[in-house]
Amino acid sequence: MTYWLVPIQEDMWDVIRDKGIYGYKENLEEFIKEGDYIIIYVSKYYAKRYGGKIVGIVKVLSNWYEDQTPIYPEETVRNKGIYIYRVKVEPVVIGECDMKKILDKIRFIEDKGQIAKYLRNAPANLKRPIPESDAKIVEECLKESLLNI
């Protein structure tokens, strides 16, 4: 069981959650495989609600495939596929976990003074998997957020 962190733009979350498809502009099959888990982090850029938060953990249900069909908001505006390398996913847990809330508990962000370098690109964390112990902390944070609704 391998966990990966990926940053997304906020408007991609609805598609990932509702259609069960995660896409990226490059093929990530070297890293993320069927059966792995993706921790979805919403970057702060242009975010209105979820910026700086982890919004879910999804399980990868397929191998990577290429699909040019525009499904994400940025793609539909341009009428062109951008995040054309895709995998089918299903939510394991959905919620809102503010990174600041768990920063002192997680190990994968080794340099707390340079948090951003661990939260960019895909997969994030400098292209390294997330330790399972950190994934469990994230999962608990997401579940706690559901209790506070």
Swiss-Prot record:
Source domain of life: Archaea
> What does the similarity note say?
Belongs to the UPF0310 family.
This protein's species is Saccharolobus solfataricus (strain ATCC 35092 / DSM 1617 / JCM 11322 / P2) (Sulfolobus solfataricus)
Question: What is the protein name stated in its UniProt record?
Answer: UPF0310 protein SSO2595
Xref: Gene3D superfamilies: ph1033 like domains
